[in-house]
Amino acid sequence: MANGFGSLYVGASGLQNAQNAINTTANNLANVDTKGYVRQQVRYADKNYTILKDSRVNVNMQQSGLGVSIGDVVHARDIFLDKTYRQETGRMSFYSARYETATYVEDLMQELNGQQFKRSVSDLWQAFQEVSTKPADSTNQNLVLQKADLLVSRTQKLYSDLQNYQSNINDQIKDDVDRVNTIGNRIYELNLQIQRVEAGGTETAMTLRDERDSLLDELGNYGRIEVTEDATGFTYVDMEGVRFVDENRCYNMGLKAADGTGFYTPYWPQQSDVEKGQYVPVFRLSGEISSEMNTDIGSIKSKLLVRGDAYGRREDMASEKSYGNIEGCTLMEVQAELDVLFSNIVRSMNDIYCPNTETTSAFTSTDGVTYPAGTKILDEENCARGVDLSLIHI
């Protein structure tokens, strides 16, 4: 009879703990749409055993099990999947920021909708073709002036819009860095709370771990991170190869604003000497962007690249070396190319209507200033003149 009831108790323990496990399943179902919630999984364990015979007499210890119990309720997370997910979401954020910038520039150029920017250049060219047939026709002359004024206005507006977008991205970088610092400080606080809850070894800080894991997932969007957890439940975070959260504190990023533009550069205060003006940047912007080398991770790095560190100018396109300084900086490249285009158009028009020539010998002007040989002056013989053949003064 005792053996019969013993078996019933074993079966009853299985049913009771299965019922408790169903409660955990119900909790999982109730939180399906809860942001940051991690599925909980029940792990069963053996109850105590009853020794039937002394092991010193027999080779094998004869024991009778008392049933099953719930050993622990754990997070159903995988370290490998966590690492991969955070890395790939960071990569997605990197290219999403670049795509957003490219799309915005495309909209400014109105390549798909509206009046294309290149149409303004074509219209000016067509106006010159018209005036070449009848140079003295005031209608054709006014058409050139109108199309030239339109090109100047659109170029100025486009360049200004690109500068404004740079400022907008600069503000986004500041907000992102502030958010990263907030996340890091909260992770450090959660580390301490989790340690206190789990110090006795009898309870898992489920809710706290859920929040911490969610913050780590979010942090992966902003940059390349490495996460390790010790036996006490404390999580260490490295960002861009530098310790960001450890057992002592969270090492917040700083922001250095450039003179003139106000463009921000994130740096590590703990490794920098601010008084001497020596800053260690968080993100390495030089070098090849490659998935193999994991240099294409994080939205902040992407925004730093597309924004650039200044406003693009035609001098940036003067040589291969100078272009290498802005290569990959989307907005600076577009600004520099725009400046080159407009400068070439203006230079070509000047060469036609008011060409220059160099003096073969030194001369003294009417105001008494002496100019050496080789000085560039207006080529009066080949420059444009009015209807009465007089020089045009603007």
What are these model-derived regions, one by one?
Residues M1-I392:
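Structural signature of extracellular appendage/secretion-system components
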